[in-house]
């Protein structure tokens, strides 16, 4: 299972402060999907969501 793509339809800059952790395919926990999306903007290879909840 390669995970699922993050839903990155957010108004940037800034993310909502909701705490809905997701586990990225990089092994890191992100406080919400938006923060994972912001990390993806800095990368060549996007992180996907491995599972909902912390890693």
Swiss-Prot record:
> SUPFAM superfamilies attached here?
Kazal-type serine protease inhibitors (SSF100895)
**Signal peptide as annotated in the record:** none
- Pfam families linked: Kazal_1
What keyword terms does UniProt attach to this protein? Disulfide bond, Protease inhibitor, Secreted, Serine protease inhibitor
Per its UniProt entry, which superkingdom is the organism in?
Answer: Eukaryota
Q: Write down any Gene Ontology CC term.
A: extracellular region
Which cysteine pairs are covalently linked by disulfides here? 8-37, 15-34, 23-55
For this UniProt entry, the molecular function terms from Gene Ontology, in alphabetical order, are: serine-type endopeptidase inhibitor activity
* Locations listed in the record: Secreted
User: Which residues bear the site annotation Necessary for sperm binding?
Assistant: 19-20
Recorded hits in InterPro entries, A to Z, give:
Kazal_dom, Kazal_dom_sf, Prot_inh_Kazal-m
Instruction: Pinpoint the Kazal-like domain residues.
Output: 2-55
Q: Where is this site: Reactive bond for trypsin?
A: 17-18
Q: What is this protein called?
A: Serine protease inhibitor Kazal-type 1
Q: Which organism is it from?
A: Monodelphis domestica
Q: What is the lineage of its organism?
A: Eukaryota, Metazoa, Chordata, Craniata, Vertebrata
């Amino acid at each position: 299972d390669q995970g699922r793509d993050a839903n990155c339809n957010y108004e940037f800059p800034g993310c909502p402060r909701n705490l809905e952790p997701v586990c990225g395919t990089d092994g890191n926990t992100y406080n919400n999907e938006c923060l994972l999306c912001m990390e993806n903007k800095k990368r060549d290879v996007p992180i996907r969501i491995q599972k909902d909840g912390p890693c």
